[in-house]
Amino acid sequence: MQVENMSFDNLLASLDKGDFDIVLSAMEATPERLENADFSDPYYTDVPPAILVKADVADQYKTLADFNGKSVGAQTATTKLDLVNDIEGATPVALASVLDLVNELVYDKVDAILVDGGVAQQYADANPDLVIAEASAELGEAAPYCIAVQKGDPKGLLDGINAAIAKMTAENKIETFIADADALADVAVEVSA
């Protein structure tokens, strides 16, 4: 197995070109993505998405309406950027990586960032200057993550992927993988904070 690390916004285009066989990157099977790829059964659902803000101004952001006229960052080509685009009056700022987004927030280049809930919690836990805005409660539930394959599954991978997901789910291995990944992410967040 070979793992390729690339920016999120290029994943489905590279998959379509055949640069790799699957995309395993916390990707949600949205209607738009289903036009260009096929998806496995869900393997994990994160906590709901969240908006990170600076702690000293958190009381200004009780509802999504409070982001009118504010710059809100999100990762390029993600459903979180779609959510930012839906916040009336907010100015979306799209960047390639979550770390870049956090740095923009820390250095006052954006007013807020919208990321996966688990990611937001890790950064808030590691950095007392960042908190999850109360307005996050209005964002709704998280969508489940799935594995993407080329449209039409020309390599016949989905049946095996779905069988592996079912087996790992039954054996609680996915939860173990998530816990291990969260522990590693906590270390990475502490180093970057």
Stretches found by the model and what they are:
Residues 15-16, 67, 105-106, 147, ...:
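Hydrophobic residues within well-ordered alpha-helices
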